[in-house]
Amino acid sequence: TMWGTKWCGSGNKAINYTDLGYFSNLDSCCRTHDHCDNIAAGETKYGLTNEGKYTMMNCKCEATFQQCLRDVHGPLEGKAAFTIRKLYFGLYGNGCFNVQCPS
């Protein structure tokens, strides 16, 4: 995980759901994202197979995560959120999926 957080990065170091790191606003964004609907690499769900190397997230969760990161401010925490946003959405770019009910 990233310094100052318990939820940002691969896995988490939190002892429970309410356990947040020093950058609590940023950590809250990551915690919510970690609990989003997803399809793990190599898994199939909703008739979709994730053939990528990384977990594929629900598109609504990705949009919410991106906005949450944008809403984090402060000289250190804001820069950390900006860095995560640029790395995650700029380099990671695994795509996302939408679930729609049949009409």
UniProtKB/Swiss-Prot annotation:
The keyword Metal-binding applies. Signal peptide: none annotated. Glycans are attached at residue 16. Ca(2+) binds at residues 7, 9, 11, 34. Its cofactor is Ca(2+). Heterodimer composed of a large subunit and a small subunit; disulfide-linked. This is Phospholipase A2 large subunit.
